[in-house]
């Protein structure tokens, strides 16, 4: 065979190969994202959308000297303190330097370090104040008066409930993270409903805190259980990079129970550690049980629901679908409790750390992308976050909306 013919044949083969499309990941799936707001200033985590369309946002002081106010509202495209700047400004600052080491402010009448906000089925706003603030040495411990749950009437922006947590409910190194409200009057003697709160203490003192919204009585459940703890040796991979924490030269990503969500009828609490990929559930009747041996019984009733990817927050719609981020897949997943199936709901290259999700009465799932995994605590003190942070929304499937009907009355 002549060399010139061989060369011609080879070139034809290469040309055909180049012209043939190689299968690749499309990178997107599901409904298109709508951009709701871009955050160019303070770093956010939680938010909620009221029935009237008002959007409330919280900015936790988990990085030193990072915020001017810890709860805000988006008004005409601007973020303003909510309900005002005064309540967001503790006298003497957020840190108490009269103690050694410094502790977080203990002001009962001011917002210290809000980590979550949520609206209930009566369209009232609940503000969860962790009471913890970052110093240059790390997260300062709390003092009584800091950790609290505040209820706000949105009509007049006034406080109707304030529950302070002592250290039997929330230890000084606890970190209240997320909250869900069930207003079913049959759940407690007070008839005012219950709050379920995740405590993902960085020091490892994890728990689910159950609060009677009438009496303010609070109890810690499933303390330190493996299901609410970071999975040993867990390393997330986001945008092709392994993410470690900086507590030592090589430290795994150790974050305990974070996201929680109630089933539409309030009978089950779903939850997940951020330091893992598993989803868990437990019937709320076991969390509400304070009888002898109730702790042993509740631990035996934990449901292991399988892997759903790495998630931070969780959320429920009126069809009882459970939604959560899947950071390693640039996606949001949908879990169907009836079938036990987890499926991607939406994918987009802009997704990386889907922090908080909120289903609204308008039939949309709102969520925030805050680049937490690019924060200095994971990259040797180098801040790799690039503003703006973002809030998006997507239309829910099958007519899903915010859960609004009474639960189990």
Per-segment meaning from a language model:
Residues 1-19:
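Fungal secretory targeting signals
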Residues 30-69:
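Beta-strand-rich domains and repeat architectures in extracellular enzymes and scaffolds
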Residues 32-36, 78-109, 157-174, 218-250, ...:
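Surface-exposed loop and turn segments in beta-propeller and other repeat-based domains
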Residues 40-51, 103-128, 133, 168-198, ...:
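Beta-rich, blade/repeat-based domains predominating
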Residues 43, 70, 74-126, 130-137, ...:
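Blade-loop segments of beta-propeller domains
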Residues 60-62, 130, 200-203, 213, ...:
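Short loop/turn segments immediately following the C-termini of beta-strands
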Residues 69-77, 143-157, 208-216, 381-399:
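Beta-propeller blade signature
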Residues 356-409:
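Blade-level signature of beta-propeller repeat domains, shared across WD40, Kelch, NHL, RCC1
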């Amino acid at each position: 065979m002549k060399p010139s013919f061989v060369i011609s044949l080879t070139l034809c083969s290469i040309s055909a190969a180049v012209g043939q499309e190689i299968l690749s990941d499309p990178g997107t799936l599901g409904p298109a994202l709508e951009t709701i707001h871009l955050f160019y200033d303070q770093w956010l985590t939680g938010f909620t959308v009221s029935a009237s369309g008002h959007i409330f946002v919280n900015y936790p002081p988990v990085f030193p000297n990072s915020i001017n106010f810890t709860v805000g509202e988006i008004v005409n495209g601007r973020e303003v303190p909510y309900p005002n700047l005064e309540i967001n400004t503790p006298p003497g600052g957020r840190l108490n330097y009269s103690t050694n080491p410094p502790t977080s402010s203990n002001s009962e009448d001011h917002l210290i370090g809000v980590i979550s906000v949520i609206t209930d089925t009566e369209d009232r706003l609940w503000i969860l104040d962790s009471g913890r603030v970052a110093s240059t040495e790390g997260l300062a411990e709390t003092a009584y008066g800091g950790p609290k749950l505040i209820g706000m009437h949105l009509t007049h922006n006034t406080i109707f409930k304030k529950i302070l947590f002592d250290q039997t409910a929330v230890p000084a190194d606890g970190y209240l993270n997320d909250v869900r409200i069930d207003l079913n009057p049959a759940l407690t003697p007070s008839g005012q409903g219950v709050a379920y709160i995740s405590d993902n203490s960085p020091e490892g003192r994890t728990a689910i805190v159950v609060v009677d919204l009438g009496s303010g009585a609070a109890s810690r459940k499933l303390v330190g259980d493996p299901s609410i703890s970071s999975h040993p040796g867990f390393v997330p991979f986001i945008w092709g990079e392994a993410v470690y924490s900086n507590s030592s030269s090589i430290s795994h990503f150790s974050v305990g129970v974070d996201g929680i969500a109630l089933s539409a009828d309030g009978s089950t609490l779903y939850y997940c550690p951020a330091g893992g990929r598993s989803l868990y559930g437990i019937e709320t009747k076991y969390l509400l049980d304070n009888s002898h041996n109730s702790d042993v019984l509740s631990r035996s009733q934990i449901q292991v629901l399988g892997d759903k990817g790495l998630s931070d927050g969780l959320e429920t719609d009126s069809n009882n679908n459970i939604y959560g981020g899947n950071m390693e897949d640039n996606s949001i997943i949908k879990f169907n409790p009836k079938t036990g199936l987890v499926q991607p709901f939406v994918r987009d290259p802009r997704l990386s750390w889907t922090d908080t999700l909120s289903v609204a009465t308008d039939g949309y799932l709102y969520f925030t992308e805050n680049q937490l995994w690019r924060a200095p605590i994971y990259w040797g003190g180098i801040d790799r976050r690039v503003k703006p942070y973002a809030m998006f929304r997507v239309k829910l499937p099958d007519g899903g909306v915010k859960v609004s009907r009474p639960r189990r009355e």
